[in-house]
Amino acid sequence: YLICSELRDIDNTKALYSIFLSESGTAIDDVIFWKFEDDLILICNASNTVKIKNHLDANSITYDDLTNETDLIAVQGKNAISIVEEMMPIPDKFFTSKDSIYTYARTGYTGEDGVEVMLDQKDTLDFIQKLEDKDVKPCGLGSRDTLRLEASLPLYGFELTDDISPVEAGLKWTLTNKSDYMGKNVIDEQIDTKSHKYLKRFKINAKQIARTGTICNSGNVSGTVTSGNISPILGHPIGFALFETNPSDNLVEFDIRGNLIEGNL
């Protein structure tokens, strides 16, 4: 009931992306479940750990909290699979596996193929050292942000929030035909009436970056930038903007420090 997906339909060793919804149909957090026979591993955004635990507790869900015992290392990039498979067998995309040390899945949230490895904290530094020995470079959230933007992947806290629903964030595909889930009545109304905000991708053929919070207009439809950055691959600014209604024009103007900069949706 707490998520919009049917957990009972997950096959063994499968990974499932889903969303915890509020009663108002907005996103509490987007998460990934890993299925192992009778066990489910729930991976939420680190910044939302306490919020998710409180939400589970409030709805009488029992669980073992491994937050302070484990680490999660995401190995991403065009060479990720060839490097990691020297240390462990690699599952198919969106599947999971585990051995005596590693529990891992081939999911990724950067647009590149990759593996997420969960392990006891006592084993983390050894694993990181093995990666560094193979010339894998550590990177931070800035690189993750440009990669996921280039792949048009929404990020919690920006395109998914306590005020934005999966429908508005372009994640209607996560909604299943469950007879009921939290916020379903609101979600169904948004789908039926199309009375919701619309998230659109944009590009700017100039150097100015439309950052989060930048006001924009497409025709007579106003919007706000949720994420914006320069794309290292494309060489120009890209991002997401949330509009009050669905724009009919693909031209958009951004108010960047008092200057109107044109772009395309």
What is the predicted role of each segment?
Residues 1-29, 78-100:
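Internal amphipathic helical hairpin motif
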Residues 33-265:
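Conserved, structured C-terminal
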